[in-house]
Amino acid sequence: MAWNYFRSYPRTDRAFPATLRLGLLEVTAFIGSEEAEKLLLRELDAPGPGVEVAYLEIALQDMAPGKHLKKILEITRELLEKLPPIPAGEFSVDRQAKGYLYSILVKYRDLVFVKTAERLLVNPDGSLDGYALSYLRRVLGADAIPILQRAIVDNRITDGVAKYAVRDAVLHYVGQSAQADKILMQTVQEGLDQQKEGREFNWGPFKVSNSALMRDFQNQPNETLLKRRQLIQNIREEFNHPTLNQGLN
């Protein structure tokens, strides 16, 4: 689901576990003994939904920081690769299983799963996995752009939200990446190509590019800000569209 790209990854609620089983895992972790650690490890060997792995990751890292992390990440990757579709009628924590698992990989900047996430990014029916997209952007940064460029031109993707999400992921790096800057200019050109003669100017196609130019403006380094300002000037000069230029002022 492409919308998941725009959402935060789900978080565990350790104060109020969503199920009795999660509550029992929490109590076991609270005991904190060697036997409790062994019990949690046995649970990790045969985990339930993604949320259980998320609870176990926190518990085991609290009890023995780093000791079981390799195993946690291996199991997380295995579950994500084989995760079946979750029916809509399931509990909320079960429907969010994929989000919980990806949140673990993002937390530890795990790069091992990158190739698999690239394969899972676009489903056979053309739908976009928003969690996979978010993972790729967060762990790779601007290095994700070549992967995302392939998604931009993937003819299987026809949904407007999915197309927007992929562009947004690339344009996070406007002013930092020459590839992102080039795609920004292409996006502006495509927006102008969509205008209808004699109709009111449609700003919709420019939302993603305008948002990229202004994103987190106050926290960017001076070099990035200067490059963004230059991009705005390039847009004015290259396309020379009165309405667009006025909107860029």
Model-identified regions with their sequence ranges:
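Long, ordered, amphipathic alpha-helical scaffolds
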Residues: 151, 157-249
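Structural detector for internal amphipathic alpha-helices that build alpha-solenoid repeat scaffolds
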Residues: 9-31, 42-45, 53-66, 87-110, ...
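Buried hydrophobic core positions in alpha-solenoid tandem helical repeats
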Residues: 1, 39-44, 72-80, 116-118, ...
